[in-house]
A protein has these predicted regions:
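Substrate-binding clefts and substrate-entry loops adjacent to catalytic sites
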Residues: 144-149, 171-182
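Hydrophobic (often cysteine-bearing) scaffold residues that line and stabilize catalytic clefts
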Residues: 21, 25, 29, 98, ...
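Pan-zinc metallopeptidase signature
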Residues: 13, 179-237
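Active-site recognition of the HExxH zinc-binding catalytic motif
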Residues: 99-116, 159, 163, 167
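Post-HEXXH active-site segment of zinc metalloproteases
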Residues: 95, 111-160
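Non-Sec secretion/translocation targeting segments of pathogen effectors
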Residues: 1-10, 162
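Auxiliary, metal-adjacent structural segments of Zn-dependent hydrolase domains
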Residues: 14-95, 113-130
Length: 237
């Protein structure tokens, strides 16, 4: 993939500046999202189904730059809801916006599945959702419009893989960007475990699970090495 000449050491300090307007921030994250999709498909498209490659190539349904709110504790957010995908990224400096956009774009590019099971007796429906290696479920009430009975597993492994792939992709663009992202230590413990897991199992097994949805192979390999039920513990790292 091509490298923007502004993304050299000379222009690196410019990436630490905050955009003057939200309109500019919006254009910046849209550009980073499109660049990320191109890079992810080039590197990892082979692990995806034809339908997923098409979904990813079309981009997320909604992407928005938002004012940064430190008390939220995050700079980016990905949501899959009723088959619609959306990303929000805090308008901070361009370096952080690129990392956050790439991180959330990886969530979008990972396995995204949503099964809705009607529950007419309860006047609502159950949702069973997979994003990457994280699985979640909940009940939605048509009467109140509210969700309840939340259940989730695999968030630790999912965030560790997402951060590891984000850092690797930034390193492909620029060593300086990759090392800066690594120093931030985002999901540090989970990322370190995923890095060790990649060294043991190889890249393909993890990427087939994350981008391709083949969790059974990953679970089987982990359990064969570490013992039965080890994968369930690993998922919550």
């Amino acid at each position: 993939m091509s490298i923007n000449p502004n993304e050299t050491t000379t222009g690196f300090n410019q990436l630490l500046e905050t955009p003057d307007t939200m309109e500019l921030a919006q254009r910046i994250i849209e550009n980073y999202h499109n660049q990320s999709i191109q890079q992810i498909l080039e590197i990892n498209g082979k692990y995806m189904s034809d339908a997923d490659r098409e979904r990813v190539s079309n981009g997320v349904d909604s992407i928005k730059a938002v004012e940064h709110t430190p008390e939220k504790g995050y700079t980016g957010f990905y949501l899959l809801n009723n088959g619609r995908s959306s990303i929000e990224v805090s308008a901070i400096n361009q370096l952080q916006m690129e990392r956050s956009t790439k991180h959330e774009t990886n969530h979008f590019a990972s396995t995204n599945r949503e099964i809705i099971v009607p529950q007419p007796d309860r006047r609502g429906y159950n949702v069973y959702q997979t994003v990457g290696t994280r699985q979640a479920s909940w009940f939605h009430s048509n009467e109140t419009g509210k969700d309840s009975e939340f259940s989730s597993k695999g968030r630790g492994l999912n965030e560790g893989l997402t951060t590891m792939y984000t850092n690797q992709q930034l390193m492909e663009i620029s060593k300086e960007k990759g090392e800066t992202a690594e120093r931030q230590g985002i999901y540090g413990h989970a990322t370190e475990i995923c890095t060790q897991l990649e060294n043991i199992l190889g890249k393909d097994t993890l990427k087939e699970a994350y981008y391709g949805g083949n969790m059974q192979n990953l679970e089987s390999k982990v359990n064969s090495i570490a013992g039965d039920k080890s994968f369930e513990n690993l998922r919550e790292c």
